[in-house]
Amino acid sequence: MRRLLAAAVLAAIVAAACGSAGQDLSPTGSTSPATTRASDILVLGGADRTTVIDASGRVVMDLGHVIGAPGWRTAFAIEIDNAGNTAVRVIDARTGQTTRAMQLTGRWAPVAEYGNAPSGLSPSGRWLVLGDPRPDRTAFQIIDTSGAVQPKRIDIPGRYSFDAVADNGESLYLVERLQGTQYRVRVADVPSGSLVPGSIIDVKQITTADQNGVMNGSYTTATAGPNGDWYFSVYQHPTKGPYIHALNTSARIAECILDLPTFGNAGAVEMAKQPFWSLALGKQQLTSRLYAVNGALGQLALVDPYEIKVKQLATFKVPAPSSKPAAFTPQSGAAVSPDGYRLYVLGESGIFLIDTIDLSLRATFATGAAFRGLAVSPDNATLYALAADGRSVAVLDARTGRPATTLQLASAADSIAIQKP
């Protein structure tokens, strides 16, 4: 299983587009009389900064290089002082004020390696993992961001990278990289500071792991389950196609969901559009639902996040895909409305609106335009779509797709989220 950045958790973003506080980004004129939700606060992530803007495009805050907790009310800044030691600042992302600071001896760095890699946070955001940046050793700091427990250092012999950390702070999951796309998932017991013998695999499956616990696949995306115990990742097996790896971070067990629509019969087109697989967690009334969806292929699977199995498969009409490599990789390629009844999906062009009651396609928005990220306002009324080049945000009526305005950004972003009120 690969890494968890985010947001994903659900989307925890490591950085964003730049701009100074109070700067007006001069959004383009409205293309219709549709109104926007003036109180929405957007968080834009990029390579080296995180910028907070309001619904008019005005920069509210420049947070710098931070890791965002779920909901983006809190962020964490990692800074190295002149003596070569590390300071971890806990920031109120609504005000920019530092609420707590911790000192670590030596240099420590965020564990994320890619734009959609794991942020190092547990699903609730309480535990933050930092890594030793030196390539000749493996060491991690497990930090209780509430300040109730002192940071714990763990040194692991060999070469490992971060995968996930349990919400109880007791299990640190690591990826042992082997040859090519082969890997093993291991767990370190945080209280004892030692690596637990054996690999974390689905013992019922022989398709994704051999007798030595060696798995095969490349990471695409991930999200935490409804209560923080399960962590779901999409992997692409090099010959069989995509599957979901489900890791129970509390029980230290794993299950593989192999009945995604194209697993076992993925051709050149399905392999080329692997980056468009996205996971989105939603809730209808009191029941959580997990959607695995690919907007480039028009493929959708409804997954029960409690029983860990596919409940329903569906297809929807999209422009005919080709076997050419994807021109870009969505950072948040699917989003569920807060009321749970609408699923928005990004394709290579356009935004597809899926009715979550029967998994049918209801509409296609912004036909011909390409986007890399989606966010839905808390009142279900407004849809924000980050352009594929990261330089603008389309603001749409979430029910009709009618464009309200376009926010032009001062510099390119690669992810978008809405800050919880």
Model-predicted segments: where are they?
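Sec-dependent bacterial lipoprotein signal peptides
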Residues: 1-16
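Predominantly soluble domains enriched in secretory-pathway, periplasmic, or organellar proteins
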Residues: 18-421
